[in-house]
Amino acid sequence: MNFTKSEQLYQEALEHIVGGVNSPSRSYKAVGGGAPVVMERAQGAYFWDVDGNKYIDYLAAYGPIITGHAHPHITKAIQHAAENGVLYGTPTPYEITFAKMLKEAIPSLEKVRFVNSGTEAVMTTIRVARAYTGRDKIVKFAGCYHGHSDLVLVAAGSGPSTLGTPDSAGVPKSIAQEVITVPFNDVDAFKQAMDRWGNEVAAVLVEPIVGNFGIVEPKPGFLQAINDIAHAVGALVIYDEVITAFRFMYGGAQNLLGIEPDLTALGKIIGGGLPIGAYGGRKDIMEQVAPLGPAYQAGTMAGNPASILAGIACLEVLQQEGVYEHLDHLGAMLEAGILTHAKTYDIPITINRLKGALTVYFTTEKVENYEQAERTDGEMFAKFFKLMLHQGINLAPSKYEAWFITLAHTEEDIEYTIEAVERAFKSLKNE
């Protein structure tokens, strides 16, 4: 493939945009560097870059594009918004309709509030939990990303359960010291942390199914233990479902797993490709939010008609019969094909898959927590990424990210992808 225009535009971008990208995850730093491919348009399951190269897309914008790009029903909703005003600064009937849809899909959402991103949604649930409990500390799990607010850009210290240290320059140590980090899927470490700090903990923040160091499911009993131990000391439980909501079924991962949190943060899929976030939960907790309560949260763009109408349209598509069966079928087909060729060429991989989302780890070790994900072979993934890119397969440029299948993908797309995987594995084997 020829990437001349992408390379030229990236050099130009470096002159005007920090790092040449508007999110560090779009950089190719984690896969050896170089110019990221600059995409010009997208339709269905496909991208076309500025050099005219076509790709099958498994990035799906890091999760939101579950219907495929430019889905006609969502496009029509966005066009309606454009023709009737995209921002009012007033209540609209659309936000009521959408709130009702979310409540019906995820029963733990007794009340909801719209914001503009998953980062905002998580940030505000933490504020609300602190307001409700009168406590300051938060427990999170190592490797789980919850947006870029100071509250959650915190890394684990040494030991199985620790007060955090800043995971970014510019995050005060004083904020990091309010965050306790423990390994995901480790009930003993969580219990140890709560035994020590539980009476100071406002909330436990967790992805019910991890999406940010790959797709990692909770061990049986893990989430129930979180609920039981947290509630025993008066702490709340917050589910970050920014990635997981509507990804595996119509509703949240909490529906799938049969365990309800006190508060939930949403984003990505619920916007149909436009910027959005939402949070909600128990009525008595949500009534801490202004104008009813003392926990302040506001937003000029919150609940704007364009994002809300796109979100309604997206959920209407996802309500159709056979949607999640299609994603699961293609996911199983892709997983089986990759595993077959890995065995043929003796490539060490482990695949974590749930429905239409999967992560291919270059390791023989089972991946159930961040420490295990860290140990996977990033150098081999980087080579694999480039080999796939040159065959027209667009993956996230990180060993930690998921492959997302959309409603627009076909069996033919999966078959071509499996063939590309075989060629990539053959090249890796012959090095």
Swiss-Prot record:
InterPro entries: 4pyrrol_synth_GluAld_NH2Trfase, Aminotrans_3, Aminotrans_3_PPA_site, PyrdxlP-dep_Trfase, PyrdxlP-dep_Trfase_major, PyrdxlP-dep_Trfase_small. It is found in: Cytoplasm. It catalyses: (S)-4-amino-5-oxopentanoate = 5-aminolevulinate. GO terms for biological process: protoporphyrinogen IX biosynthetic process. The modification N6-(pyridoxal phosphate)lysine is found at K268. Its EC number is 5.4.3.8. Homodimer. This is Glutamate-1-semialdehyde 2,1-aminomutase 1. It comes from Anoxybacillus flavithermus (strain DSM 21510 / WK1). The lineage of its organism: Bacteria, Bacillati, Bacillota, Bacilli, Bacillales. The gene is hemL1.
